[in-house]
């Protein structure tokens, strides 16, 4: 099993190109099931989760062709996928495929909308709390589908097609919003999604669906209106840059010190996180090529942060911020409100010498002068990269094990960091 070896202490200086957003690329690929024409997606990141979803879609009969780089593309330019779901041969998504990635459960929406039936295994993926699919099922039932759970599968049918409806989520749900959005696009009549998630990735998917002939308004607000259409056509769409990758590398620079240009980043996608970094002592400069992050020799300031749905501080940057605050001058407080059981990285950060106390959903981090390298084990995607950030600043050698979590969400992380001066390498075997 691959590991990552880091020798800490080097500042980061240079340019890091930001990849396409995983959290947009996955639902965009799934949206390809909604049409029998070809959907072309540019700037798709090369990630394990993307490859896994290609296998899942292939199981349904979807033909996916990955095109090479075009003239003028950057070395790290994401891949272009041509997705053709002209002939859907199977409406069942089996356990052995879905169990490896939770987002793959979302195929239930386009299969139900277009084929009027679906049988999808209950999902897998990162072990963060329970993440129930109840809200997704509720949304599809509102649209007129009949759903039952049998033998670990959700069996859905809508023989007469889906019908527009009012869907009011009791709490903000990104997954539920994606599923409702895709399903309602081909439903008869008007659908209104209340308390919808406002994340940029939702907006990106809605933009793509509109290019395909959908009639969606209000994406990015808590109220989305969808006028159902009979058919969607092919389109070409570029995946937006990854705000979580942007924030992760910005925090790495704040941790080590240095000067790094995050090429292609869009600051409006993560303003709350950039504000926190500024408060912590980093300097953020917006320019035509993205975001420049610098930190001189001054120490890090402690911060108090509560995770929240967009535009609040992202839960997917919580672990990285905790690693950063492990070296702040004073006590920081981080409260997690989105997912339960999302502090599994605490015990691993403690192996570096971090001082962290948990009280319910709040972590108190008492900064230390220096972290020490250690062998550590990744527990989930975002926790794994927090260990990399800690290792970049720690004295001595750090070995991060179980890095398959990293490969699910970060494209060529060790290469991007190494190009900026970090001593980091992947060890195979």
Curated annotation (Swiss-Prot):
Keyword Hydrolase included in the entry's annotation: no
GO BP, one annotated term: cell wall organization
Pathway the protein acts in: Cell wall biogenesis; peptidoglycan biosynthesis
Main location: cytoplasm
Protein localization: Cytoplasm
Domain of life where this protein originates: Bacteria
Active-site feature positions: 126
Family under the similarity heading: Belongs to the EPSP synthase family. MurA subfamily.
Protein name per Swiss-Prot or TrEMBL: UDP-N-acetylglucosamine 1-carboxyvinyltransferase
Gene that produces this protein: murA
């Amino acid at each position: 099993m691959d590991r990552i070896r880091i020798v800490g202490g080097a500042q980061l200086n240079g340019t890091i190109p930001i990849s396409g957003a995983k959290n947009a690329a996955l639902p965009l690929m799934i949206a390809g099931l909604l049409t029998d024409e070809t959907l072309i997606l540019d700037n798709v990141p090369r990630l394990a989760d993307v490859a896994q979803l290609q296998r899942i879609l292939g199981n349904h009969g979807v033909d996916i062709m990955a095109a090479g780089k075009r003239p003028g593309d950057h070395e790290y330019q994401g891949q272009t996928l041509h997705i053709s779901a002209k002939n859907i041969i199977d409406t069942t998504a089996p356990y052995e495929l879905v169990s490896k990635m939770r987002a793959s459960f979302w195929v239930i929406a386009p299969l139900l909308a277009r084929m009027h039936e679906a049988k999808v295994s209950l999902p897998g993926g990162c072990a963060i709390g329970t993440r129930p699919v109840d809200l997704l099922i509720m949304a599809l039932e509102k649209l007129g589908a009949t759903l039952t759970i049998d033998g670990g599968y959700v069996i859905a049918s809508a023989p007469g097609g889906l019908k527009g409806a009012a869907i009011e989520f009791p709490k903000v749900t990104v997954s539920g919003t994606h599923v409702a959005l895709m399903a309602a696009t081909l439903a008869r009549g008007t659908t209104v999604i209340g308390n919808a998630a406002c994340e940029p990735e939702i907006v990106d998917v809605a933009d793509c669906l509109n290019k395909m002939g959908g009639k969606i308004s209000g994406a990015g607000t808590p109220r989305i209106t969808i006028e159902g259409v009979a058919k969607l056509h092919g389109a070409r769409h570029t995946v937006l840059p990854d705000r979580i990758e942007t924030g992760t590398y910005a925090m790495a620079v704040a941790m080590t010190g240095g000067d790094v240009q995050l090429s292609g980043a869009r600051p409006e996608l993560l303003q709350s996180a950039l504000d926190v970094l500024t408060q912590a002592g980093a300097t953020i400069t917006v320019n035509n090529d993205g975001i420049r992050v610098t930190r001189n020799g001054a120490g890090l300031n402690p911060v108090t942060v509560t995770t929240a749905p967009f535009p609040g501080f992202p839960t997917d940057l919580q672990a990285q911020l905790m690693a950063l605050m492990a070296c702040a001058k004073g006590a920081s407080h981080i409260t997690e409100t989105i997912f339960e059981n999302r502090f599994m990285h605490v015990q691993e950060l403690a192996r570096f010498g971090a001082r962290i106390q948990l009280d319910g959903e709040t972590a108190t981090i008492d900064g230390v002068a220096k972290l020490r390298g250690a062998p550590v084990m990744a527990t989930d995607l975002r926790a794994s990269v927090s260990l990399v950030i800690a290792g970049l600043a720690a004295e001595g050698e750090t070995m991060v094990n179980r890095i398959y979590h990293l490969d699910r969400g970060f494209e060529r992380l060790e290469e991007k960091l190494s190009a900026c001066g970090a001593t980091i390498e992947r060890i195979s075997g």
